[in-house]
Amino acid sequence: MKGLVILVSLMCLALYNRICAYQVRGMRSDVLCGDIRFTVQCICNELGYFPTERLDKPCPWPNREKRSAPEDELAFEDYEDQDYFHPRALSIPSEIEHDNEKESDAFSILSRGKREIAFYQECCNIRTEHKCNRTTVSLYCRTY
């Protein structure tokens, strides 16, 4: 009986594999679930929100080309040592960290974790959902 309980527990843990994925409207293929930061960079490039972003590898969906700025348009010397530099850091603004958030943001901040807040700050307003490994995650995209 103990063996059966342990076996069922292990099966439940194996099946409960929550991996986040982010998807936007118009993309017909899956995104790379394991590398969220790089996937978000690809999404922002795909949408044209960060057209000057330089990507070090192709985006994780077929038939897509990476976008890059001409070498003389922007200087990235300070960031060449950092992998997959993003023009805006995926972080929580200091007002939110110190509980000085705007009243309109209060509900959304209370209902999201830190990682979700970071993505909410980067890409907002167009809500889409994508299923990846039995987990549904929303992505919000905003034009600047």
Curated annotation (Swiss-Prot):
Signal peptide: 1-21
Single GO MF descriptor: hormone activity
Annotated propeptide span(s): 68-113
Cysteine pairs bridged by disulfides in the record: C33-C123, C42-C59, C44-C141, C124-C132
Residues carrying sugar: N133
UniProt keyword annotation of Signal present: yes
InterPro entries to which the protein is assigned, alphabetical: AGH
Gene Ontology terms: cellular component: extracellular region
Any one GO BP annotation for this protein: spermatogenesis
Predominant subcellular localization, coarse grouping: secreted
Keyword check for Aminoacyl-tRNA synthetase: no
Pfam (any one): AGH
Tissues with expression: Androgenic gland.
Keywords associated with the record: Cleavage on pair of basic residues, Developmental protein, Differentiation, Disulfide bond, Glycoprotein, Hormone, Secreted, Sexual differentiation, Signal, Spermatogenesis
Subcellular location: Secreted
Function: Controls sex differentiation and the formation of male appendages, spermatogenesis, pigmentation, and male specific behavior.
Name of the featured protein: Androgenic gland hormone
Organism: Armadillidium vulgare
